[in-house]
Structure formats: C-alpha cells, structure tokens
C-alpha cells in the first residue's frame, strides 16, 4: 500500500488476508541490505485501555496516499488533522511507556524483519466505529455469553500473522520470535504456546 524509507530499514504498510473473510492492514519493517534471510519478530501491542492506536504503539506510524488525499488526489486537511492526531497519540504513548523508543523500529534497525497488526477493535480495526471502551466491554461480554472469547480471536489473528510473516521471502522462518508488553506479553505467551513458528 505504501512505503517509508527510514534509517537502515524500510517501513511498509501492507494488507493481507487474516482468514477467508477478513483482510487487515499491518506495518512491516524490513532491514536494508543483507544477502540472506533475516530473523523476524511479531510485535504485539498492549491494551492500556487505549484502543485508538494498536500497531502504532509498536511501530512509528506513517501515512499512505489514500490516507492523505481526497478522491480527486488533493491533500485533505481533514485527513491531515486525523493523521496528526494518530501520530501525536502514538508519540505520547511511546514517550510515556517506552521511553520514546518504538520497539519495532528498534528491532528493524538491528536487523530484524518486524510485523505488527491491530488486535480486533484497536487502531484501524476499531477507529472507524469510534473508540469507546464501553463498546469493547459490551462486545467482549456478549462474546463470552455466546461461548466465545475475544482473546481467542486475537490469538488466532496472531497465529495467522506469524504464518504470513514466515511465508515472506526475506524471512528466515526458523528464526521468528514475538514481543509485547502487558496484553502484548499475554499475546506473546499464547502465540509461543500455540504456534510452532515461534
């Protein structure tokens, strides 16, 4: 969808099918150079009762043309303001909780391919509907009454993302890890237990 060259690596915004019915966007970071395959990391964002951003907590956000322009190709002031809100929010989050360091960007600069997605209801998978914590609680509660679990859906998405990452030509599928803090640590624990790729 789009690309941003950074210091020692490139950031891509991509889309892929998480299952037969759902296509999601993700950030993918790829180190520059290298003749062989790179080790890789699935970067899993936290909860923090903050659903407005997801993958942007792990990888410094950037915006592709369709996120900046109107249908006629002109820069949209409304989209520009929305993008700035996302960037400011992500920077504030990372400064407050990660000492100003985007974990995914750090790993890419040190030779890892990094993939990060939004968990269901976070970031782009929830922002359009409005980020209301009460909606999250209602949906999670209703799923439990139906014998379903939102964290199981997250884990399924994380496993599918790992399979996608392993399929990329620049990735050494035998050297994939995962990282996350708080809910991201829980997701890492579940992914490590349920995926043979980790």
Residue ranges and their predicted role:
Residues 16-20, 30, 46-48, 121, ...:
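Short, flexible loop/turn elements at secondary-structure junctions
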Residues 36, 44-156, 167:
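Cap/lid segment of the alpha/beta-hydrolase catalytic domain
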Residues 2-40, 75-79:
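N-terminal cap/lid segment of alpha/beta-hydrolase-fold proteins
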Residues 26-33, 104, 190-193:
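Short amphipathic alpha-helices and their capping/turn segments at secondary-structure boundaries
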Residues 37-40, 110-113, 172-175, 196-198:
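Loop/turn elements at helix/coil->beta-strand transitions in domains of secreted/extracellular proteins
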């Amino acid at each position: 969808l789009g690309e941003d060259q950074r210091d020692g690596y490139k950031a891509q915004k991509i889309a892929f099918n998480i299952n037969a019915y759902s296509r999601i966007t993700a950030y993918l970071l790829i180190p520059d150079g290298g003749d062989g395959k790179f080790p890789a990391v699935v970067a899993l964002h936290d909860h923090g009762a903050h659903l407005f951003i997801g993958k942007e907590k792990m990888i410094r956000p950037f915006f592709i043309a369709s996120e900046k322009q109107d249908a006629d190709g002109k820069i949209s002031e409304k989209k520009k303001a929305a993008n700035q809100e996302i960037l400011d929010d992500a920077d504030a989050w990372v400064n407050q909780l990660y000492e100003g360091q985007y974990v995914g960007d750090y790993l890419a600069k040190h030779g890892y391919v990094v993939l990060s997605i939004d968990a269901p209801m976070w970031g782009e998978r929830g922002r359009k509907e409005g980020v209301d914590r009460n909606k999250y609680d209602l949906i999670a509660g209703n799923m439990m009454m139906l014998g379903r679990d939102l964290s199981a859906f997250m884990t399924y998405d994380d496993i599918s993302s790992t399979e996608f990452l392993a399929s990329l030509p620049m990735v050494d599928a035998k050297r994939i890890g995962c990282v996350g803090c708080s809910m991201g640590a829980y997701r890492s624990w579940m992914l490590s237990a349920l995926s043979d790729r980790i």
